[in-house]
Amino acid sequence: MPKDAPAGLAPGFLVAAPALADPNFNGSLVLMAEHHAQGALGFVVNRPGPITVADVLGGLDERLRERAEGAGRADDPVLVGGPVQPERLWILFRPGPTAPEEGAVALGSGLALGGSRELLEALVRSRDPGPYLLLLGYAGWAPLQIEHEVGEGAWVPLPLQGDLVFDVPMEKRWETAVRRLGLDPAGFLVGGGGAEA
């Protein structure tokens, strides 16, 4: 059984305000996985990177790439999860009847997160893995940094809603999150800030 994630702003989302000029986070929707006294960790879930699932899996094991092709997942983009450790691979997935749980953290709202090669291989090899995203890198904040940025209006917290990740097209996730906050994306203007790189 997956262990639980820490409380605070996580699990949840941070919706970037339009005035957030940092190119790593402008227009981003960040899934917050950890938030505690030592800082915070999250993943941008709406920024496709230049490589695909097939590129990553083919680099690990050609049979995994072939399974992804057979499942119609080979051309899915790998997301840019954030500027910290951009070579580190993470897996965000919706646990299902055959999806592995070993090595994963349950975030709630039907989402789980892991970062091991074993988890990725088990997920791709499972009979019906369900939806998953691969992400490279993460967003990290020093102690009290994200609280300061939220206070300045650079980010607006949104409760965790798993459908935003897997049921809303990537290019519509930020706009959908803004609308769920009860705001009009065209008129959503607040302060600035940024996460640490």
Curated annotation (Swiss-Prot):
Note one Pfam family from the annotation.
DUF179
The family assignment reads: Belongs to the UPF0301 (AlgH) family.
What InterPro entries does the database record attribute to this sequence?
A: AlgH-like
Disulfide bond annotation, renumbered to this chain: none
Q: What is this protein called?
A: UPF0301 protein Adeh_3962
The organism sits in which domain of life?
Answer: Bacteria
One GO location term (cellular component): cytosol
